[in-house]
């Protein structure tokens, strides 16, 4: 136990090119309150290990967060979310209205589904030449303060290659976080 020698687990966790999959995911969860699903944990650890191989350095929590933001959160091409609204359209239906920038062009889309993610998936399939399957999505709360944020994760399967890609989104809205995650995954798919 690290406490036996006056340390904490955080002080002895090292992520480098020889690290296993859990190190970077553990640091994201403990330092940034982001819990990755298993498949995304594997994908992200490979990205971190490649970065560690390229630099020859240990990956600190801050570097791991910067890579996470770069790979999942700050993607704005070819899709960028401009606005999003969701309204009940019956007992089990919601209608979304979204404005996206797609390859520099503003596109307004509307569609109905059994929830906001389903409706947005339907709208994107109807308006863009993108073939994918929504394989999984989920979210967790990043803090319990009055400024709580949701961290969401989406897994898409490419309709052409059958490869999985993950996207992530963070927002104070529990509706917008998975919407942002879907856009992130679409941008990684493209």
Annotated model-derived regions:
Residues 112-116, 124, 154-164, 179-181:
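Terminal-proximal interaction/regulatory segments of ATP-powered molecular machines
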């Amino acid at each position: 136990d690290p406490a036996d020698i006056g340390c904490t687990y955080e002080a002895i966790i090292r992520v480098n090119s020889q690290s296993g999959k859990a190190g970077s995911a553990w640091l994201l969860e403990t330092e940034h309150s982001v819990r990755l699903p298993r498949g995304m944990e594997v994908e992200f650890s490979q990205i971190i290990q490649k970065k560690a191989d390229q630099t020859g350095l240990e990956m600190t929590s801050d570097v791991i967060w910067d890579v996470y933001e770069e790979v999942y959160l700050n993607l704005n091409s070819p899709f960028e979310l401009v606005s999003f609204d969701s309204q009940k359209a019956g007992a089990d239906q919601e209608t979304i209205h979204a404005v996206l920038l797609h390859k520099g062009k503003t596109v307004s889309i509307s569609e109905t589904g059994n929830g906001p993610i389903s409706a947005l998936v339907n709208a994107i399939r109807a308006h863009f030449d993108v073939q994918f399957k929504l394989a999984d999505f989920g979210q967790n709360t990043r803090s319990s303060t009055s400024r709580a944020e949701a961290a969401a994760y989406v897994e898409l399967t490419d309709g052409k290659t059958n490869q999985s890609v993950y996207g992530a989104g963070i927002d104070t809205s529990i509706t917008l976080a998975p919407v942002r995650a879907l856009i992130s995954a679409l941008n990684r798919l493209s």
